[in-house]
Amino acid sequence: MTVVPDVVSLVDVADDSTVSRTVLKGEGARLVLFSFDTGQELSEHTAAVPVLLQALDGLFEITADERTVDLRPGDVIHLGARLPHSVLAKEPGRLLLTMIDSRQLAALKPTH
């Protein structure tokens, strides 16, 4: 078991910037905490593994799969591996990215 207390406090929102910090590398998952100032964005990109996006504070616009949705605190979005997506901060905030290494998880499943 690994505990990351008060994860939101690990990265401050910086003026006119996007900041990222890996806060956990664990078995089957990696957590990256991002902070964004208003108007900052991650242009369209992909991830090699499935990911979960969770807004910790602030408001984000997520575009993927020909859809655009707002991501607010308490919301979670799942994106499949290699799905092109982008992130835009509509207000200052922090976003937690969970990268799920399904290959590693599959290796952990018992075989019968």
For each feature predicted by the language model, list its residue ranges.
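Conserved short histidine dyad/triad with adjacent acidic residue
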Residues: S17, R30-A47
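Short beta-strand His + acidic residue motifs that chelate non-heme Fe in jelly-roll/DSBH
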Residues: L42-E44, I62-T63, L79, P84-K90
